[in-house]
């Protein structure tokens, strides 16, 4: 389906981009309104953010999922970025996650068990990262080029953090751009997922007082 154009009123539209934008807009809305599919929010998000985009690629676009970042990619680049970013963010978050706003927000939401917290955070973010740093990023890169794609996918990602502590929300545009850059450099959504999983888990563990 890549490159298929439809013309309406003399205006050309890329059909694949239309579908990607619809999915990238409607799925977060359905998630926001709390449509309960499994009884667990993280499992619901696997369906919304991972399974639906994946089925779209395979059944509708009829393209290899690797073309949308679902692969190991350039693992050397990915591993280096993952290690460096996680170390730097650990130092920053050690202090930021102790602020009253972060503690108030995450103490009420963090699971009691450390293992449960890490597990459910990983499940929750797996599909989330695939939608932005896989499905949307690589589709947009074809249509608009990688630079624009990296910026564009970061916008909805940042807006969906509204309601979280202000400091965290204000940094997410830059975080989303960084994640997109790493995904493009490594040609994989896996490394942004690993980084995001670490950042989210570490933040909750510090803010809720479960470690340090």
Segment roles from a protein language model:
Residues 10-61, 81:
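Alpha-helical transmembrane segments in multi-pass membrane proteins
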Residues 30-33, 57-65, 94-98, 182-185:
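Structural signal for the C-terminal ends of transmembrane alpha-helices
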Residues 1-11:
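Short, Lys/Arg-rich, polar N-terminal cytosolic tail immediately upstream
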Residues 30-33, 168-212:
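Functionally important transmembrane alpha-helices
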Residues 24-33, 87-95, 154-162, 198-207:
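Aromatic-anchored segments of alpha-helical transmembrane domains
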Residues 10, 127-152, 181-188:
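Membrane-interface helix/loop boundary segments of multi-pass membrane proteins
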Residues 35-44, 64-127, 142:
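Juxtamembrane helix-loop-helix connectors linking adjacent transmembrane helices
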């Amino acid at each position: 389906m890549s490159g298929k154009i439809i013309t309406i009123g003399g205006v050309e539209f890329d059909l694949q981009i239309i579908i990607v934008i619809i999915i990238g807009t409607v799925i977060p809305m359905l998630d926001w309104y709390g449509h309960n599919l499994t009884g667990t929010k993280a499992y619901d998000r696997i369906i919304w953010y991972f399974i639906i985009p994946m089925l779209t690629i395979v059944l509708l676009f009829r393209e290899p999922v690797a073309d949308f970042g679902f692969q190991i990619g350039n693992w050397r680049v990915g591993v280096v970025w993952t290690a460096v970013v996680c170390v730097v963010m650990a130092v920053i978050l050690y202090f930021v996650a102790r602020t009253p706003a972060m503690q108030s927000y995450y103490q009420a939401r963090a699971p009691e068990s450390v293992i449960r917290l890490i597990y459910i955070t990983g499940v929750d973010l797996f599909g989330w990262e695939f939608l932005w740093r896989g499905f949307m990023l690589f589709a947009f890169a074809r249509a608009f080029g990688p630079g624009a794609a990296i910026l564009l996918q970061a916008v909805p990602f940042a807006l969906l953090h509204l309601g979280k502590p202000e400091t965290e929300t204000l940094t997410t545009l830059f975080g989303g751009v960084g994640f997109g850059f790493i995904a493009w450099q490594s040609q994989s959504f896996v490394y942004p997922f690993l980084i995001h999983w670490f950042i989210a888990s570490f933040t909750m563990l510090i803010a809720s007082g479960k470690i340090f």
